[in-house]
Amino acid sequence: MAKAFRKSKSFSIDLSADASTIAVDLLRVLKSRYDYKALSTITGIPVSTLTRYITGKTAPRASKAERLLKNLLENVNLAALISENAGYNGGVDLAAVMLNPNILKIIGAHILEEFSGMKITAILPLDILSIPLASYLSTAISRPMYLLSSEPITADGHSIPIIFREDGRGSAKAYWLLIRRNCKSDSVLTISTQVPDPCLFNTLIEILAENKIDLGGFFTVIAEEEKLRRLKIPPGVRRSYIILA
């Protein structure tokens, strides 16, 4: 998977570079849920060809691989898959989803498709359950990962305190943002399981702007519409979610 995407000079996410690796990866994940006949119906690819792909005897190439990847993502009901694994019924425990490597591969592919062609130079998980997904993406597209922590972080980087008040009142809380040195002109993709606290997020956006870092994209697995409206996401920034609550 780590070799499936090459880092371009523009730092945009490039789905055309060896997409066969992740397409086959997804086929193998889906094979655990469907038989070859069902997969053939979904993809329009003969069973014999699917067998060769999944067993590693051959692999789709170039534009064919990219078309296959898009076809797979269009035919996977991610919202239903997440609901099924997390028992979503208005309240949800996402640990079963975000710690499942097979589901992470599908969500990761979905994110790469959503933000394909956009300048992304770093990945920033906003909650603890989104760290595995952020790590997967960071490895997949060879981008550094920022960290946001409720505890001070000591590392070879630049740690910035973020002071905010939940719901704009009460006692002040502090988080720490760990970014790389020489981060000016970075464009960050934030990853979260649910919509982050608006006060924390809006303060984070201010801190990023002060350090000449752009918000390149916003992704959350589950979006609560009321909280989403309170986020000060800059105009033109792509936002993406799987389930709207």
Regions found by a protein language model. Name each.
Residues 119-129:
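Short glycine-rich phosphate-binding loop at a beta-alpha junction
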Residues 2-22, 203-245:
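PRPP-dependent phosphoribosyltransferase catalytic core
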Residues 41:
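Alpha-helical residues within the helix-turn-helix
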Residues 133-141, 204:
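Short Gly/Thr/Asp-enriched flexible loops that form oxyanion-binding sites at enzyme active sites
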Residues 121, 186, 216:
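Conserved acidic residues
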Residues 10-33, 37-38, 52-119:
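Active-site-facing substrate-recognition patch
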Residues 142-189, 198, 202:
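Short, glycine/charge-rich flexible loops or terminal/linker lids adjacent to PRPP-binding catalytic cores
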